[in-house]
Amino acid sequence: MRKIIHVDMDCFFAAVEMRDDPSLRDIPLAIGGSADRRGVISTANYPARRYGVHSAMSTAMALKLCPHLKLLPGRMAAYKEASQHIREIFARYTPLIEPLSLDEAYLDVTDCSQCNGSATLIAEQIRQTISDELNLTASAGIAPIKFLAKIASELNKPNGQYVITPAQVPAFLQQLPLSKIPGVGKVTAKRLEEVGLITCADVQQYDLAALLKRFGKFGRVLWERCQGIDLREVSPERLRKSVGVERTLAEDIHDWEDCEALIVDKLYPELELRLRKVKPDLHIARQGVKLKFQDFQQTTQEHVWPVLNKDDLINVARQVWRERREGRGVRLVGLHVTLLDPQLERQLLLPWE
């Protein structure tokens, strides 16, 4: 049985700013773009969250909820420096580190001899070391499989940890709401609820063939997670090749204006936020759009583009909408980017000789 730790820094960007300027600690603070340029919130501290401010929210909305919100543009160099220090701390315990972004990672400590091999004590020590050396707090989840470790890291935030031992997995899954499983959004959770599926226990008792017929490949993944199956290993060599966001709609849409509003107000801000966590300069190889129609057929279109660009994505989506929809309702809209190959990127950065 593996010992997996998921470490998630607490409001990371804001925490770095509060550490470097203590006067910011007790006031509502957010990192993001300006409201007049349709900016997006990257993260918010806990005083701001009490007003309802959260990541991926438009800055304009955040300022409506909290007019006295302190807004900073962010210092990506400082965040990257702190992130690198944190990864160096991880490496003192295990070489099996899978970074997910600047502020979170999976660690496999199965073969770690420190702390007598106790994953719980290792997580505590890592969090204490981060606090001592960087004056930042982290939360952690400990479990025998990845998706449960990630869920566990959210259960005792901020500056805490939660352990799910192998013996506790069955009971934990029995009462776990499906909405807590990564990949189950609000619309999907609602559709699951429509057929009586609310917790993992419900899925465990549901016919797999019926689940596959109704939900396709996702049904298989959901069934496995509800059985406590997650065969994914912590992969240090994992290279993220793409970043994407998509929304399954509660009702099919038929007007381009509704699609454009979804892209501008919801999807693009979230895509920019996710991309900035793994590629702060927003440099990419390609960007594209995905539409799924009411008959479950889907289509994608990509453009070669050097930097994430909202106007281009809207133009691509408009073209796909006009040329391929054929009068059908649209049930899902997605945006994605393909990242630059690291080797090619390094070659492009080499000076000419």
UniProtKB/Swiss-Prot annotation:
InterPro entries in the record: DNA/RNA_pol_sf, DNA_pol_Y-fam_lit_finger_sf, DNA_pol_Y-fam_little_finger, DNA_polymerase-Y, DNApol_IV, IMS_HHH_1, Rev_trsase/Diguanyl_cyclase, UmuC
GO molecular function: damaged DNA binding; DNA-directed DNA polymerase activity; magnesium ion binding
Compartment annotation: Cytoplasm
Protein's UniProt name: DNA polymerase IV
Originating gene: dinB
CDD domains given in the database record: PolY_Pol_IV_kappa
Functional note: Poorly processive, error-prone DNA polymerase involved in untargeted mutagenesis. Copies undamaged DNA at stalled replication forks, which arise in vivo from mismatched or misaligned primer ends. These misaligned primers can be extended by PolIV. Exhibits no 3'-5' exonuclease (proofreading) activity. May be involved in translesional synthesis, in conjunction with the beta clamp from PolIII.
Disulfide bridge positions per record: none
UniProt-annotated catalytic positions: 104
Quaternary structure note: Monomer.
Site (Substrate discrimination): 13
Organism expressing this protein natively: Serratia proteamaculans (strain 568)
Boundaries of every UmuC domain copy: 4-185
